[in-house]
């Protein structure tokens, strides 16, 4: 199509997607299904590893899987019927009926990856520069690609966002999330039973831990085949952030330390703290975790998701605190709404203007909601 003044709905848009993880695949699949000519470029050379474990499977995520992939959501999700808060001794403080649905990063990634054509998913291709006016991308190897539309779905560390908005950067929220997953088979029967069919929490001073079952590494959702996903939000409480985020190789990381890379003294100190600061069942879960990891909690707000014929999608534009349980859902919604906007408007300019306005507003509201939730739960609001 001519780049701007023809209807994207009438002819194919050529689309370059930078980023082949969750946001990029939501985009690639949604636009491919809408009839556009999409190519996805992922900087990693091989298949992506799981980057976080559990996901709350919001309705928009389940709907996307049902409509656009071969996966039936019920086959890749777990459910709970009760939300439970524990006391420090492990007794039940409150229990309320609350139906929740969960899945795992790897289950959703596999479904999306299988739904997108192999010949248009390119690994080892890192975008290093973009020209928004022409939707052109330059890669690390010096090659270039022009398209009608460029979508940067590169996550919270997006280099494209840094180029388009150099004054925008993530703001540290003054606390971290320790995380891990444990095969159900590694838990005692009593501990596994304590978390079965329950979304379980414990709130301490400047601390909040939660846990729920997710599909196993091969997608198993039957008892015994699952994994228990846990997240422990924790204020730094005087600890040195630089020391905490220095990995086993001695490199200081800005956003966190991945599984298997924690320094032994840091990991040992947090495990020791778990044994005294958490209820017995949660302490047992942390003790059974092979490779816990830690991530910094950040807030990120971008003034606009659209610059000319380039747009930012998902965490590349907005990072809300995980308490919202909406990061994956927002990426799916961004992608679906982008496909709808291209179909509903006569020109690319009009489509991007409408989409950018609506999704920027949604992202801003989500970030603010995450701030309120996190500050309230961690006692940081003053």
Predicted features and spans:
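C-terminal domain-closing interface element
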Residues: 376-382
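Short, flexible hinge/linker loops that cap or flank conserved catalytic cores
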Residues: 7-10, 144, 224, 303-306
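Active-site-adjacent segment of FAD-dependent monooxygenases/related oxidoreductases
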Residues: 44-115
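Extreme N-terminal leader/targeting segments of oxidoreductases
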Residues: 1-14
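Conserved FAD-binding catalytic core of PHBH/FMO-like flavoproteins
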Residues: 71, 91-93, 99, 103, ...
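A short coil-to-beta-strand element that immediately follows conserved catalytic motifs
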Residues: 267, 278-293
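Conserved mid-domain beta->alpha element of the FAD-binding
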Residues: 17-33, 37-39, 44, 151-152, ...
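Short, flexible helix/strand-to-coil boundary loops that buttress conserved ligand/catalytic motifs
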Residues: 51-52, 68-69, 164, 324, ...
